[in-house]
Amino acid sequence: MAQQRALPQSKETLLQSYNKRLKDDVKSIMDNFTEIIKTAKIEDETQVSRATQGEQDNYEMHVRAANIVRAGESLMKLVSDLKQFLILNDFPSVNEAIDQRNQQLRALQEECDRKLIALRDEVSIDLYELEEEYYSSSSSLCEANDLPLCEAYWRLDPDTDSTDCLSAPLLASPEPSAGGPLQAAAPTHSHAGGPGPTEHA
């Protein structure tokens, strides 16, 4: 709690010192400028010679001009210190700037997310169409290979007449097997051992 109270007190003290510097520098500029104007006034002759008085006035004017320059530089340094104080200690403004930047970055992130989602959907649709095309062409080729040659050719070539394919197997008659007889052989009678047929008179 003491540290939290000390921080505002230090800020208040710093602001008071800035205010005092401002008033002192402005007063120094005004006083020195007023004295320069007074020095420029020609006075009556005194015990000091006019040449000596002129040199004295010239030196005084240089000193007061240097004081004005110093006060001006002090004011410029005060402006820089005030800017630094505001940048480092003006937390509401800093937080507001941070919030605005965060909102801009969130909006940019949402826009990028929307574009990425749209791109993903387009790629998914194109990939799905390519897969359908690929698998449909593959399945048609597989079905054609599983079918008989004539039917597969007929499916691949719609102009071909189906009757030609159906009549093609009938044109080639199957060859008989080498071991099986086509017809039953007639029985033969042997005349070597027995007598011939009886002749009637």
UniProtKB/Swiss-Prot annotation:
Keywords tagged on the record: Activator, Coiled coil, Nucleus, Transcription, Transcription regulation
Quaternary structure note: Component of the Mediator complex, which is composed of MED1, MED4, MED6, MED7, MED8, MED9, MED10, MED11, MED12, MED13, MED13L, MED14, MED15, MED16, MED17, MED18, MED19, MED20, MED21, MED22, MED23, MED24, MED25, MED26, MED27, MED29, MED30, MED31, CCNC, CDK8 and CDC2L6/CDK11. The MED12, MED13, CCNC and CDK8 subunits form a distinct module termed the CDK8 module. Mediator containing the CDK8 module is less active than Mediator lacking this module in supporting transcriptional activation.
Gene name tied to this protein: MED22
Pfam families assigned to the protein according to its UniProt record, in alphabetical order: Med22
InterPro entries: Med22 (IPR009332)
A Gene Ontology molecular function term of the record: transcription coregulator activity
Keyword Nucleotidyltransferase attached: no
Cellular localization per UniProt: Nucleus
Function recorded in the entry: Component of the Mediator complex, a coactivator involved in the regulated transcription of nearly all RNA polymerase II-dependent genes. Mediator functions as a bridge to convey information from gene-specific regulatory proteins to the basal RNA polymerase II transcription machinery. Mediator is recruited to promoters by direct interactions with regulatory proteins and serves as a scaffold for the assembly of a functional preinitiation complex with RNA polymerase II and the general transcription factors.
Taxonomic classification: Eukaryota, Metazoa, Chordata, Craniata, Vertebrata
Full protein name: Mediator of RNA polymerase II transcription subunit 22
Superkingdom, taxonomy of origin: Eukaryota
Coiled coil (residue ranges): 93-123
Entry's Gene Ontology BP terms: regulation of transcription by RNA polymerase II
Annotated source species: Bos taurus
Statement: the UniProt record of this protein carries the keyword Ligase: no
Start and end residues of each stretch annotated as Disordered: 166-201
